[in-house]
UniProtKB/Swiss-Prot annotation:
This is Control protein C.MunI. It comes from Mycoplasma sp. GO terms for biological process: DNA restriction-modification system. Residues 12-67 form the HTH cro/C1-type domain. It comes from the Bacteria.
Length: 74
């Protein structure tokens, strides 16, 4: 079973590409996060705070529950 951070990062990358078609840099700037910090989340290397999860979900136009749906299945 993959680490939860890796599974979440994979889901986040997929959603970013599907919902925004923006690069990591452009999306991070849009939601007011540092690009390297955001990249490390997508790569499963960092934990993320609730405040930043809210920024990410808003930037993707989805709810927090949608952000976490199906992570266990990946």
């Amino acid at each position: 079973m993959n680490d939860i951070k890796i599974r979440f990062g994979n889901k986040l990358k997929k959603l970013r590409k599907e919902k925004t078609d923006l690069s990591q840099e452009s999306f991070a700037a849009q939601i007011d996060l540092d690009r390297t910090y955001y990249s490390s989340i997508e790569n499963g290397k960092r934990n993320v705070s609730l405040v930043n999860l809210e920024k990410i979900s808003a930037g993707l136009g989805i709810t927090l529950s949608e952000l976490f749906s199906d992570i266990e299945k990946e």
